[in-house]
Amino acid sequence: KKDGYLVNKYTGCKVNCYKLGENKFCNRE
């Protein structure tokens, strides 16, 4: 399951998350 794997790039940051296809992306606030 790949969902959320990109979230790890922002560990320790406050993020806004959204799903796009099979991947979960987060943007730093």
Swiss-Prot record:
Compartments (UniProt record): Secreted
Record flagged with keyword Secreted: yes
Descriptive protein name: Toxin II.9
Record-linked SUPFAM superfamilies: Scorpion toxin-like
Domain remark text: Has the structural arrangement of an alpha-helix connected to antiparallel beta-sheets by disulfide bonds (CS-alpha/beta).
Principal location class: secreted
Expression by tissue: Expressed by the venom gland.
Keywords noted in UniProt: Ion channel impairing toxin, Neurotoxin, Secreted, Toxin, Voltage-gated sodium channel impairing toxin
LCN-type CS-alpha/beta domain mapped to chain residues: 2-29
Protein role: Binds to sodium channels (Nav) and shift the voltage of activation toward more negative potentials. This toxin is active on crustaceans.
A GO term, aspect molecular function: sodium channel regulator activity
Highest taxon of source: Eukaryota
Organism the protein comes from: Centruroides limpidus
GO CC terms, sorted: extracellular region
Family stated for the protein in its record: Belongs to the long (4 C-C) scorpion toxin superfamily. Sodium channel inhibitor family. Beta subfamily.
